[in-house]
Regions:
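Short, small-residue-biased leader/transition segments that mark boundaries at the very start
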Residues: 1-7
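Core structural elements
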Residues: 11-12, 113, 184, 195
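Short, well-structured alpha-helical segments
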Residues: 14, 101-109, 201-206
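Active-site flanking loop/helix segments enriched in acidic
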Residues: 14-40, 61-73
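Short acidic alpha-helix initiation/capping motifs at coil-to-helix transition points
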Residues: 30-33, 78-85, 116-117, 178-186, ...
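Divalent metal-dependent catalytic cores for phosphoryl transfer on phosphate-bearing substrates
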Residues: 39-162
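Charged substrate- and nucleic-acid-binding regions of tRNA-handling and nucleotidyl-transfer enzymes
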Residues: 89-93, 150-234
Length: 234
């Protein structure tokens, strides 16, 4: 109730929130209307500004994107993008810094991702939030709150988020490759192989990291150098 009252107060300065009030999602997975769901998500996220604001805006785009599918259920395709748009429109009124807008954009835009507790999935989500450790934890916080605000059947999904976040923490602790900067090869190594200095180096490093992230090559120095040589020959 407290969160819902706060949201109602916020509607005076964030008009897009009014459209969520009483908006039926027409889907058994969602036991609340969009307004009630948003209030539940706000209440079920940790009390720090980034994730609380993200919770407030994360579904603001649902009324804009709503449609009834062939299954006679409600669907909101690409609603996170519409939600980001509403956040950007309100940013000036709310005096969000450019950094806050940037961080909110990423957390809202990708909150519907479904990470699995696998290294491949963790690397993917970490890349989506631009290899920012704080944003990885923030998006996990929002995902948990979002799940709790959807249905009482969300326990399994929350367990997966927790497991993925635990795996991320363990990968950090073990110094595993989570971003291009973590690769056991660098620009100097690639130049020594004959890669031209300049943007080509960054492109090859990105390709090497993609290969590691997709588990196409082991994150080991010699294996990566061999792959870089193949890139140069192709």
């Amino acid at each position: 109730v407290g969160s819902e009252m706060c949201i109602r107060d916020s509607a005076y300065i964030v008009p897009c929130i009014e459209a969520m009030d009483g908006f039926d999602q027409h889907n058994p997975w969602h036991i609340y209307d969009v307004w009630e769901h948003t209030a539940a998500v706000v209440e079920n996220t940790p009390a720090y500004p980034l994730v609380r604001w993200a919770a407030l805006f994360h579904d603001a785009g649902k009324p804009d994107t709503f449609l009834i599918g062939a299954d006679n259920l409600g669907h909101m395709p690409n609603h996170p993008i519409a939600s980001v748009h509403h956040m950007r429109e309100s940013a000036k009124t709310l005096h969000f810094s450019k950094k806050m807008q940037h961080d909110l954009d990423l957390v809202i835009r990708y909150h519907g991702d479904r990470p699995e507790p696998t290294t491949k999935s963790v690397r993917k989500l970490y890349a989506l939030v631009e290899h920012n450790e704080d944003l990885f934890h923030a998006i996990c916080d929002l995902m948990r709150g979002d799940a709790r605000g959807k249905s009482t059947r969300a326990t399994k999904w929350i367990q997966k988020i927790n497991a993925a976040e635990s795996l991320f923490n363990e990968m950090l602790k073990q110094g595993e490759v989570l971003s291009p900067a973590d690769l056991p090869v660098n620009g100097t190594d690639l130049i020594s192989l004959g890669v031209p200095q300049g943007p080509h180096v960054g492109l090859v490093l990105s390709e090497l990291f993609s290969a590691v992230a997709n588990e196409e090559v082991a994150p080991e120095r010699e294996a990566l150098l061999a792959l870089a040589r193949r890139f140069m020959q192709s």
